Amino acid sequence: SIVTKAIVNADAEARYLSPGELDRIKSFVAGGASRLRIAQVLTENRERIVKQAGDQLFQKRPDVVSPGGNAYGQEMTATCLRDLDYYLRLVTYGIVSGDVTPIEEIGIVGVREMYKSLGTPIDAVAGGVAAMKNVAATLLSAEDSSEAGSYFDYVVGAMQ
């Protein structure tokens, strides 16, 4: 988080936090309530977000759920939705921390290679994450949607 980074940097230089670092921490702390509110809305609506995003993805990419597609059949469709749920969870971690580090460290590193080795079209997974962003936007205020959207966009960008 911003707090941890500022402290680690200051300590490495054996100094107190600078006025700029303190201002960034103040802004981070002040935004904490909204970040928690956003994460709570996403968490409470996770099943709805994942299901609607999956429906949008499968409608846009019927090849994924057609015979021979990576999400063909009930079990594989459930696996696809499980993956979307995983990325939604990572997004909430990023929102709460106010930083993309948890997204990077927990589960985005190597994702392209993993899906490529499985023969999964990464653009479809990224499309599912983008669809979750759109569904989430319907549950949040414009300001909260913008905050959350940057984390969804980060995940999508990491997949491209």
Curated annotation (Swiss-Prot):
Q: What's this protein's family per the entry?
A: Belongs to the phycobiliprotein family.
Positions of modified residues (N4-methylasparagine)? 70
Cellular localization per UniProt: Cellular thylakoid membrane
Q: Which GO terms describe its cellular component?
A: phycobilisome; plasma membrane-derived thylakoid membrane
Any one biological process term the GO annotation gives:
photosynthesis
Q: Which organism is it from?
A: Anabaena cylindrica
The superkingdom of the source organism is Bacteria
The entry's (2R,3E)-phycocyanobilin-binding residues are 80
Question: What is the protein named?
Answer: Allophycocyanin alpha chain
- Does the keyword section mention Electron transport? yes
> Self-association or partners: how does it assemble?
Component of the phycobilisome. Heterodimer of an alpha and a beta chain.
**Entry keyword Transport:** yes
Database matches in InterPro entries: Globin-like_sf, Phycobilisome_asu/bsu, Phycobilisome_asu/bsu_sf
Q: How does it sit in the membrane?
A: Peripheral membrane protein
Role: Light-harvesting photosynthetic bile pigment-protein from the phycobiliprotein complex. Allophycocyanin has a maximum absorption at approximately 650 nanometers.
Q: Keywords on this record?
A: Antenna complex, Bile pigment, Chromophore, Electron transport, Membrane, Methylation, Photosynthesis, Phycobilisome, Thylakoid, Transport
PANTHER family with a match to the protein in the record: ALLOPHYCOCYANIN ALPHA CHAIN (PTHR34011:SF2), PHYCOBILISOME 32.1 KDA LINKER POLYPEPTIDE, PHYCOCYANIN-ASSOCIATED, ROD 2-RELATED (PTHR34011)
**A UniProt-annotated Pfam family:** Phycobilisome
Modification after translation (UniProt) = Contains one covalently linked phycocyanobilin chromophore.
